[in-house]
C-alpha cells in the first residue's frame, strides 16, 4: 500500500502546549467540530479537505470573535511569560489538565457476552423460536419437533 504524501508537508509536526490548550478548551466547551478544525490546522492539514465548505465557514464565523479574544490573551501571555516557553513540549500543560476533572477515572469493562450476527432473518427467527421453546416448553417436546420455517411460511408478513 503506497500512499502519496507529497501534499502533506507537516505530518510529523507536534503541537505546542498553547495549541493543545485551545483544543482542550474547545472540547470542554462542547465545540467538538471546532476542536477538529483546530487539530487539523495545528497538525498542518487544510480543514477544507475534510470538512464541507458551509460547515467550515459557519465554524469560522462562530469562533472568530472567540479566536480574536484568545489570540489577544495568547499574545499577552506570551509576552509576560517568556520563561515558560523553555518548558519541554513533552510535558502536558498544567492549565488544561486541571480542567479535566476525571482524568484519573478508570472503569474496567468486562467482555461482552453478545455477539453481532449477520442479517439472516430466517436464522434469527429460528433462534428466537428455539429460545422461546427452551424457556417455556418441556425439553422432551422440543427434541421431538423439527422447527424450521421460511419467511414465506409466515402469513402475517404477506398481509
Curated annotation (Swiss-Prot):
The keyword NAD does not apply. Residues 1-50 are annotated as: Required to complement a hetP deletion. One of its GO terms (biological process) is heterocyst development. Induction: By nitrogen deficiency; expressed in proheterocysts and heterocysts, transcription requires hetR and is suppressed by patA. Transcription is up-regulated by 6 hours after nitrogen stepdown, and remains high for at least 24 hours. Transmembrane segments: none annotated. Disruption phenotype: Normal vegetative growth, unable to differentiate heterocysts in 24 hours, by 72 hours less than 1% of cells are heterocysts. No heterocysts appear before 48 hours, by 120 hours only 3% heterocysts form. Double hetP-asl1930, hetp-alr2902 and hetP-alr3234 deletions have the same phenotype. A triple asl1930-alr2902-alr3234 deletion makes 50% more heterocysts than wild-type (although they are not active for N(2) fixation), while a quadruple hetP-asl1930-alr2902-alr3234 deletion has delayed development but makes wild-type levels of N(2)-fixing heterocysts by 72 hours. Keywords: Heterocyst. The keyword Repeat does not apply. Promotes heterocyst differentiation and commitment when nitrogen is limiting. Interplay between the 4 HetP paralogs controls the timing of commitment to heterocyst formation and its duration. Epistatic analysis show that the 3 paralogs act upstream of hetP to delay commitment (asl1930, alr3234) or inhibit development (alr2902). Asl1930 and Alr3234 must also attenuate the activity of Alr2902. Required for heterocyst formation. Functions directly downstream of master regulator HetR to promote heterocyst differentiation, functioning downstream of patterning (cell choice). In Nostoc filaments, approximately every 10th vegetative cell terminally differentiates into a heterocyst specialized for nitrogen fixation under nitrogen deficiency. In bacterial two-hybrid assays interacts weakly with Asl1930, Alr2902 and Alr3234. Belongs to the HetP family. The first 68 residues are fully capable of complementing a hetP deletion. This is Heterocyst differentiation protein HetP. The gene is hetP.
Amino acid at each position: 500500500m503506497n500512499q502519496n504524501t507529497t501534499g502533506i508537508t507537516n505530518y510529523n509536526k507536534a503541537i505546542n502546549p498553547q495549541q493543545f490548550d485551545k483544543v482542550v478548551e474547545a472540547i470542554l466547551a462542547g465545540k467538538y467540530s471546532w476542536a477538529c478544525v483546530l487539530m487539523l490546522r495545528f497538525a498542518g492539514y487544510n480543514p477544507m479537505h475534510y470538512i464541507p465548505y458551509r460547515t467550515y465557514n459557519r465554524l469560522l464565523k462562530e469562533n472568530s470573535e472567540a479566536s480574536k479574544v484568545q489570540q489577544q490573551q495568547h499574545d499577552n501571555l506570551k509576552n509576560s511569560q517568556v520563561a515558560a516557553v523553555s518548558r519541554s513540549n513533552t510535558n502536558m500543560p498544567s492549565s488544561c489538565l486541571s480542567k479535566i476533572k476525571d482524568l484519573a477515572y478508570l472503569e474496567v469493562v468486562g467482555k461482552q457476552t453478545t455477539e453481532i450476527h449477520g442479517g439472516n432473518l430466517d436464522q434469527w427467527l429460528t433462534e428466537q423460536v428455539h429460545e422461546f421453546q427452551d424457556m417455556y416448553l418441556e425439553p422432551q417436546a422440543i427434541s421431538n419437533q423439527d422447527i424450521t420455517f421460511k419467511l414465506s411460511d409466515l402469513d402475517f408478513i404477506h398481509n
